[in-house]
């Protein structure tokens, strides 16, 4: 889809608010008669032929910067007031009434702000109309001001208009919402949402669930509870979680669906945290290592990382890659992701269209002395020479070797070699970190031959390095691990799973040198990110995925021992990661991953694997390995036509006191609810003596896991 930069309208008005000039701003050479701006001109202002001006108001400007720009655009040297019929700009009333300098009232407090245009003008990416009046022509001339134009803004705009015809704005946008709000839905609101899902008949799966500290989980669509907290989950047709709520908070992934479901419910929502991540795919690749050659803080702010930019208000982050751009915003701003992508593509065309080779000496003061440094016993800094020794063997067009030395020639023709007075660091290699980040071939001196390294192959033989190469640096546990990274396990599990295993690290850092096998954390399992927010989400994931999951210091197993798979997952910041064994040879950069030793955790499973009947009645048998009806494992989904009731049961005082508040008033329509309410009834009927609870449980669940842990 090709992004069309919307036209903009600037209206200069006189004393009677009559339009003196109508400027139609566009980077194109024509009027788009189908645009909302032209419709507004023709239908509301009766202006058929405005002035076409090949300019563009940057939506990232502050109000003071905008006033300076508009004064320059209209060639006005007097104090001016800017306003709009649709949104408040530099002035607004305390009740957010639209400000008009010709119709001023002192009954309301007037506020002045210097915010960014895209924040104060809703929909500015698609429809921007700004009215400009000389302050002396209004009823409040004292509110006017004059601002000098920032020459950098004009310079940037001129360059933007020059490169615009060559920009490829064919883009495709994907979005992901992660919004969490504090709300007062409570049980009543959740039940209304369930009813609305059923009324809309949209075939979305909805589920109410309830769990306690003992992980007794109840699920279904109809509950009658006394002040008990519930969890609501709704999945769309692709089985993607659309929203999740416990009545007090709600996480929203599908904003439109949530809006439809609560249109008549007073949710009293208060944002806790929220963001939207847009992934914009580009038809034409860009240079991800962007560099701004003029002062452009009125658009983006550069960061220490070359491929990351921030918006001027630092609330929007932009991560650049060759073929796509990721934009993360705090609040929904219509089409801001497309507009920022347009600016990035333009800047790339202005300043970064050709990848320039970097001379090593230009980065010497930043990196050479820190990473490839000379110390008392190490001479790792290469030296520059002016010629090749006779008899040196040509390895490639930029690398020569003899028995005494190796020489690398960079793209600028500068020759580097390693001559260590101690005779140790004489092998030329390259710094991985800069090659991985920027494809820079920065030479450094090493103890051993580097020709087997992937970075060496790329710099010397121009062999493409695998894109998904994993960095040998191991992160501390706690951060989300990306595809090219790995991290340590939490201390308690690192000690347990890696007992008897070793990983040799380089001195003074966390770079893996060699290991014959060591458990670590890898990135998210599978192609899609799996986010588990509640205990109910965790239990459901484990039972469906049928693998072990580590959450904090707890281990979650599938309900049936025979279902336990060979994977180990671990939850970090609500995102599912994988535990794997890493292997690496000291002589190679290649890192291999293998399945974990899952049996170490499986042996802790607190339930015997030999099937033992617990109770049976009327052909229904509850065993330690599942629930059977007429000898057949019960694993079919129940239709919502079938409803089960948990009745009040006369039992011992201790059992009744514990279970009655939880299960006395429950009605449900789901398989899990049917099984668990039936099971609890059996437990209550058994009339277990409170003094014999532990021995009775150990009869059916003899392996608690404590013996293995101790």
Swiss-Prot record:
Q: Per its record, how is this protein called by name?
A: Early transcription factor 82 kDa subunit
Q: Name the source's superkingdom.
A: Viruses
**Assembly information from the UniProt record:** Heterodimer of a 70 kDa and a 82 kDa subunit. Part of the early transcription complex composed of ETF, RAP94/OPG109, and the DNA-directed RNA polymerase.
Q: Where in the cell is it found?
A: Virion
Q: Which UniProt keywords apply?
A: DNA-binding, Transcription, Transcription regulation, Virion
Give one GO molecular function term: DNA binding
InterPro entries per the UniProt record, alphabetical? Poxvirus_early-TF_lsu (IPR007532)
Q: List cellular component terms (GO).
A: virion component
Q: Which family does it belong to?
A: Belongs to the poxviridae VETF large subunit family.
This chain's source organism reads: Monkeypox virus
What Gene Ontology terms for biological process does this UniProt record contain?
Answer: positive regulation of DNA-templated transcription
Parts of the chain that traverse the membrane: none
Q: What does the UniProt record say this protein does?
A: Acts with RNA polymerase to initiate transcription from early gene promoters. Is recruited by the RPO-associated protein of 94 kDa RAP94/OPG109 to form the early transcription complex, which also contains the core RNA polymerase. ETF heterodimer binds to early gene promoters.
């Amino acid at each position: 889809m090709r992004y069309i930069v919307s036209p903009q309208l600037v209206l200069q008005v006189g004393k009677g608010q009559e339009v003196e000039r109508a400027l139609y701003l566009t980077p194109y050479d024509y009027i788009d008669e189908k645009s909302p701006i032209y419709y507004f001109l023709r239908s509301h202002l009766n202006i058929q032929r405005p002035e076409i001006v090949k300019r563009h108001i940057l939506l990232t400007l502050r109000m003071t910067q905008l006033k300076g720009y508009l004064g320059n655009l209209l060639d006005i040297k007097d104090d001016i007031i800017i306003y709009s019929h649709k949104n408040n700009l530099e002035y607004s009333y305390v009740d957010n009434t639209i400000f008009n300098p010709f119709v001023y009232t002192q009954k309301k407090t007037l506020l002045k702000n210097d915010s960014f245009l895209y924040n104060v003008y809703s929909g500015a990416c698609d429809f921007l109309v700004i009215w400009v009046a000389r302050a002396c022509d209004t009823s409040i001339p004292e509110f006017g001001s004059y601002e000098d134009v920032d020459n950098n803004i004009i310079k940037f705009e001129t360059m933007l208009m020059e490169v615009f015809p060559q920009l490829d704005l064919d883009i495709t946008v994907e979005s992901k919402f992660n919004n969490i709000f504090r709300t007062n839905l409570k049980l009543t609101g959740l039940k209304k949402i369930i009813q609305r899902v059923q009324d809309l008949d949209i075939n979305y799966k909805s589920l109410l669930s309830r769990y306690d500290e003992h992980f007794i989980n109840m699920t279904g669509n109809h509950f009658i509870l006394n002040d008990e907290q519930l969890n609501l989950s709704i999945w769309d047709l692709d089985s993607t979680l659309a929203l999740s709520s416990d009545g007090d908070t709600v996480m929203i992934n599908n904003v439109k669906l949530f809006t439809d479901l609560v249109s008549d419910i007073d949710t009293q929502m208060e944002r806790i945290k929220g963001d939207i991540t847009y992934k914009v795919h580009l038809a034409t690749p860009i240079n991800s290592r962007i560099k701004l050659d003029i002062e452009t803080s009125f658009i983006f702010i550069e960061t220490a990382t070359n491929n990351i930019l921030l918006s001027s208000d630092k609330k929007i982050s932009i991560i650049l890659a060759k073929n796509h751009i990721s934009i993360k915003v705090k609040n929904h701003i219509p089409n801001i992701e497309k507009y920022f992508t347009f600016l990035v593509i333009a800047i790339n065309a202005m300043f970064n269209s050709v990848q320039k080779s970097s001379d090593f000496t230009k980065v010497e003061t930043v990196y050479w002395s820190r990473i490839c440094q000379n110390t008392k016993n190490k001479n790792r800094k290469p030296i520059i020479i002016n010629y090749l020794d006779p008899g040196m063997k040509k390895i490639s067009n930029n690398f020569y070797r003899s028995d005494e030395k190796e020489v690398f020639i960079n793209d600028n023709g500068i020759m580097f070699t390693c001559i260590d007075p101690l005779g140790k660091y004489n092998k030329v290699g390259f710094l991985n970190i800069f090659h991985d980040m920027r494809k820079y071939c920065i030479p450094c001196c090493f103890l051993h031959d580097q020709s087997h390294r992937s970075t060496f192959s790329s710099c010397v033989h121009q062999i493409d390095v695998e894109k998904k190469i994993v960095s040998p640096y191991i992160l501390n546990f706690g951060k989300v691990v990306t595809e090219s990274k790995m991290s340590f396990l939490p201390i308690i599990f690192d000690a347990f799973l890696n007992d008897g295993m070793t990983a040799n690290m380089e001195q003074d850092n966390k770079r893996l040198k060699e290991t014959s096998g060591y458990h670590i954390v890898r990135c998210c399992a599978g192609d899609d990110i799996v986010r588990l927010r509640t205990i109910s989400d965790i239990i459901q994931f484990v039972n469906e995925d049928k693998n072990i999951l580590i959450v904090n210091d707890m281990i979650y197993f599938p309900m049936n021992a025979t279902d336990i798979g060979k994977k180990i997952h671990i939850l970090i910041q609500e995102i599912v990661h994988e535990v794997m064994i890493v292997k690496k040879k000291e002589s190679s950069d290649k890192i291999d991953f293998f399945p974990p030793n899952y049996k170490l955790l499986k042996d802790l499973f607190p339930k015997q694997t030999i099937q033992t009947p617990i109770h049976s009645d009327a052909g229904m048998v509850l065993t330690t390995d599942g629930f059977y009806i007429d000898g057949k494992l019960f694993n079919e989904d129940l239709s919502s036509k079938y409803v089960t009731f948990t009745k009040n049961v006369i039992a011992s005082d201790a059992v009744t006191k514990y279970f009655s508040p939880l299960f006395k008033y429950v009605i449900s329509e789901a398989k899990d609810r049917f099984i668990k309410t039936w099971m609890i009834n059996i437990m209550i009927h058994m009339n277990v003596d409170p003094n014999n609870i532990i021995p009775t449980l150990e009869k059916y669940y003899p392996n608690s896991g404590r013996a293995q842990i101790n």
